[in-house]
């Protein structure tokens, strides 16, 4: 019974707010993070196990097509054992708005690939009929040398995304003496073992790595795995630290800004219950300080207040990963008080009037800091009064809007705008020219660098 309640504990009332907040703090706590590493390493030594990294791949995942291109580098640079598993795509509880998610993965993978020196050029998803043949090939040749098998996975994946059925068939002719045996072989579900394995490790996404208690998703988090392996002394040589480096664009020279130039418009879509939103504020502010940008802050309701579910495994990963990212970017997650429900509603009710004073961004920034660093109930009226005063605002005029409902239609309008850019989660971003033309959307704090790249491109084109 308890287990069933925990499946979607974020949205269940059976588990009280204090218990939920404590669990969230345990998952994001830095001391717990490093203690787990020490415990896992002691256990590994005691059991005499090698340094084993698990890699989870799905042919239908564009991000997996990126990660398979770096696997051989990982093996050649580190003294590790790599085990490869194929897995199914997670349920809709883990990936709400599935159609939007699939479209996003395709677009995002194609957009980031060149910056990592990788290839992915598919404009659309492959024909489903070719997937079974692809998995038959990978299942049939799974006993070959691992390096050759990794090459085969990449080749099969490339042909699949190119919808090249003839190319897939030619692989069989090249590698098998009995083509009919492979084609007629009744394939077992190649994903069964991988699905069980990844569930046992409390994770759900493909294109991911797992090493001794920690999950690392895709190219974006591979650096964390490398750092950990380096700390354990597993680097084989003194080659460059990162096996995959992101190409950085040169920063735009502020001296080139012409005073009469119209600023770009950046719309920022945050929510109050998102740790990823909290750790993004600092970098968004840096963009505003660095470039001629007009910022529009457009909050939306948290996913849980939009009747979406967050399974426990996902919640745990979100907290641990956002804390890890926060430490990297200088936005520490410490004490947590989740504002879901009444606290968020009360805080949102003041946003329209506070934003009319030009303080909407700072207000939401301080609210998320209160929730994810100070552990404060942001629905407390004394706190809201103190925050209003800190922002230099007249509390007597602000407080009359507390617990009113006019904010709901504003947030609903913001949500529709965010969805129009194929973004359903936060933080999301929309960059336009000053006349609102040429909208460019990005979802997630992971892609703030792409927003900056687009800003640089647009400003540079004016020179």
Predicted regions and their residues:
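C-terminal cap of thioredoxin/glutaredoxin-like
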Residues: 2-6, 10, 19-25, 33, ...
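Conserved strand-turn element in the central/C-terminal portion of the radical SAM core barrel
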Residues: 58-60, 125-128, 267-273, 337-341, ...
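Structural alpha/beta surface segment adjacent to cysteine/selenocysteine redox centers
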Residues: 59, 65-160, 279-371, 462
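Short, charged/polar micro-motifs that form catalytic or ligand-binding hotspots
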Residues: 57-61, 99, 215, 271, ...
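Soluble or luminal CAZymes and related metallo-dependent hydrolases
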Residues: 101-105, 186-190, 276, 314-318, ...
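Short boundary motifs at domain starts and secondary-structure transition points
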Residues: 41-48, 253-261
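Short active-site neighborhood of thiol/selenol oxidoreductases, capturing the structured segment around
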Residues: 47-63, 77, 81-82, 260-275
């Amino acid at each position: 019974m308890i287990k069933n309640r925990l499946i979607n504990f974020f949205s269940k009332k059976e588990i009280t707010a204090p218990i939920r907040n404590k669990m969230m703090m345990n998952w994001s706590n830095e001391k717990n993070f490093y203690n787990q590493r020490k415990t896992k390493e002691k256990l590994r030594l005691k059991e005499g196990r090698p340094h084993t990294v698990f890699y989870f791949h799905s042919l239908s995942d564009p991000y997996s097509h990126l990660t398979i291109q770096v696997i051989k580098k990982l093996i050649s640079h580190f003294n590790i054992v790599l085990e490869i598993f194929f897995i199914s795509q997670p349920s809709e509880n883990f990936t709400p708005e599935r159609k939007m998610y699939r479209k996003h993965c395709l677009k995002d993978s194609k957009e980031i690939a060149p910056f990592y020196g990788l290839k992915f050029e598919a404009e659309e998803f492959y024909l489903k009929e070719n997937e079974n043949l692809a998995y038959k090939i990978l299942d049939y040749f799974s006993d070959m040398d691992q390096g050759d098998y990794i090459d085969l996975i990449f080749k099969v994946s490339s042909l699949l995304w190119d919808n090249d059925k003839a190319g897939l068939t030619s692989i069989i002719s090249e590698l098998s003496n009995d083509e009919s045996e492979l084609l007629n072989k009744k394939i077992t579900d190649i994903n069964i073992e991988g699905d069980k394995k990844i569930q046992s490790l409390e994770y759900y996404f493909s294109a991911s790595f797992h090493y001794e208690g920690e999950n690392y998703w895709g190219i974006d988090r591979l650096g964390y795995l490398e750092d950990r392996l380096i700390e354990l002394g597993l680097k084989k040589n003194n080659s460059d630290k990162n096996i995959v480096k992101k190409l950085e664009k040169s920063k735009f020279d502020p001296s080139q800004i012409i005073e009469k130039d119209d600023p770009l418009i950046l719309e920022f879509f945050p929510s109050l219950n998102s740790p990823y939103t909290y750790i993004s504020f600092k970098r968004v502010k840096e963009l505003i300080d660095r470039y001629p940008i007009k910022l529009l802050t457009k909050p939306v309701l948290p996913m849980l207040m939009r009747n979406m579910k967050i399974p426990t495994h996902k919640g745990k990963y979100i907290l641990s990963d956002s804390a890890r990212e926060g430490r990297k970017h200088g936005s520490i997650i410490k004490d947590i008080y989740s504002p879901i429900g009444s606290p968020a509603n009360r805080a949102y009710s003041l946003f329209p009037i506070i934003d009319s004073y030009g303080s909407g961004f700072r207000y939401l920034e301080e609210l998320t800091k209160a929730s994810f660093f100070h552990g404060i109930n942001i629905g407390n009226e004394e706190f809201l009064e103190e925050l209003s005063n800190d922002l230099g605002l007249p509390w007597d005029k602000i407080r009359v809007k507390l617990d009113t409902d006019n904010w709901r239609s504003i947030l609903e309008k913001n949500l529709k705008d965010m969805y129009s850019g194929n973004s359903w989660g936060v933080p999301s971003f929309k960059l336009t020219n000053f006349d609102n033309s040429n909208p460019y959307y990005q979802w997630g704090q992971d892609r703030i660098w792409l927003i900056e790249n687009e800003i640089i491109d647009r400003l540079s084109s004016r020179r």
